[in-house]
Design a protein with these regions (language model features):
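Asp-based, Mg2+/Mn2+-dependent phosphohydrolase catalytic module
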Residues: 1-8, 38, 94-98, 119, ...
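N-terminal helical cap/lid subdomain that shapes the substrate entry/recognition surface
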Residues: 3-116, 143
Length: 231
């Protein structure tokens, strides 16, 4: 099989979100608030356990009143915000407005960093004439993240779940991405970190390759095998 197009997931594949501690510190600083260090660390850990940071850990428990929003969170911007701010509100903060501020922070370029080998791999694909798309379950526009970090020139199409009302693993989302790139599924490789969501591309006929969802420092070259796979 000749690969003519590669689709990448966003979070945990090309980019990694900041830590919960960094996330909380940034929002408190922006609000001009402080917490004693032990309390800040406890609060950050509680937010992590709650799954309040999109792109971070999954929630240890989803409250019953949020189960519907959580299951369909990536289908609309409104549900995405409702799900994650709802999880955040399980953790007491000094000001209730901080819950929305935390959500807003996670949509900023400063909250994200590309994996160390992301640019190298994307450049390698471009030099081989291979089309690149991003397919993400998400509730907001991630294009500014790619522009700010210099990766946008490598991407031929962005297919975001909330813009189509379809979530991975629905094959229609991957089909939309293939159509946007002008490639057929049988000549397309999907790269992601979620075996259920990203694995949905296999039903369409795409090859699938998984990477580990790890902190960037712990995964310096996890994307490089993609270049070997496309030849």
């Amino acid at each position: 099989m000749t690969i003519k197009g590669v689709l990448f997931d966003f979070s945990g594949t090309l980019f990694r979100i900041e830590s919960s501690e960094s996330w909380l510190r940034a929002v408190l600083d922006e609000a001009g608030m402080t917490l004693p260090e032990p309390e800040l660390l406890r609060t950050a850990a509680a937010l992590e356990d709650a799954g309040a940071l999109a792109g971070g850990s999954y929630p240890q428990h989803v409250p019953e009143h949020l189960t519907g929003a959580w299951a369909t969170r990536d289908s609309t911007a409104e549900l995405h915000r409702a799900a994650y701010t709802g999880l955040s509100r399980q953790v007491p903060l000094p000001d209730p407005a901080l819950h929305d501020a935390l959500y807003d922070r996670h949509m900023t370029p400063a909250a994200w960093a590309p994996y160390p080998d992301a640019a190298e791999v994307l450049e390698g694909l471009r030099s081989r004439g291979i089309a690149v798309g991003v397919v993400s379950n998400i509730g907001w526009d991630l294009r500014p993240i790619f522009r700010e970090h210099g990766l946008d020139p490598y991407v031929g199409a962005y297919v975001l779940s909330y813009e189509h009302g379809i979530q991975k693993p629905d094959p229609r989302l991957f089909a939309t991405a293939c159509d946007a790139l002008g490639v057929i599924p049988q000549e397309t490789l999907m790269v992601g970190d979620d075996r259920r969501a990203d694995g949905g591309a296999a039903a369409l006929g795409c090859a699938v390759h998984f990477v580990e969802h790890l902190p960037a420092a712990d995964r310096p070259d996890g994307l490089r095998p993609v270049l070997d796979m496309v030849g």
